[in-house]
Amino acid sequence: MTIKSDKWIKKMSQEHNMIEPFEAGQVKVINNQKIVSYGTSSYGYDVRCADEFKIFTNINSSIVDPKNFNDKNFVDFKGDVCIIPPNSFALARTVEKFKIPRDTLVVCLGKSTYARCGIIVNVTPLEPEWEGYVTLEFSNTTPLPAKIYANEGVAQMLFFQSDEECETSYADKGGKYQGQVGVTLPKC
């Protein structure tokens, strides 16, 4: 597997709608205001998060069970800035919709701007032929509230292309998160 360059990312996005909406360059300023950058980088694509969030709360004193997740553990929030409580987390989704080629695997890493503030981004790999908006998880590892800015860069996607197509893609196996639109909670 080889990591793909900005040239490949641009071609696949402009000719095959791999990323929509797509930004061919790096956006660092909007309306004369500095932002956390997003768009195409040398060997990746910096995604933005939308303004829809689910903030974790334990007001119900429940146990977190991935097989039987209680959606009442989240508070829905819509806005330009999400405040994550200390030692807690929030879910969001990307502004961008992805359509991953059959011979490609995508790995997500956090941006240094957030990592240096104790905010960790966690996303599982985007498998071959997966399509949809990516659900993002932000962990606030600090003892203080932390801000996440909507419509600004939050994570970088790295694209790895195999020398052969997989036998069974995410679409072939009917993956449970195929075509997700909003912030998607655990499914089992």
UniProtKB/Swiss-Prot annotation:
Its EC number is 3.5.4.13. It comes from Francisella tularensis subsp. holarctica (strain LVS). The active site is at residue 137. It is an enzyme of class 3 (hydrolase). This is dCTP deaminase. Catalyzes the deamination of dCTP to dUTP. SUPFAM superfamilies: dUTPase-like. Pathway: Pyrimidine metabolism; dUMP biosynthesis; dUMP from dCTP (dUTP route): step 1/2. The keyword Transit peptide does not apply. It catalyses: dCTP + H2O + H(+) = dUTP + NH4(+). Keywords: Hydrolase, Nucleotide metabolism, Nucleotide-binding. The gene is dcd. DCTP binds at residues 111-116, 135-137, 156, 170, 180. Belongs to the dCTP deaminase family.
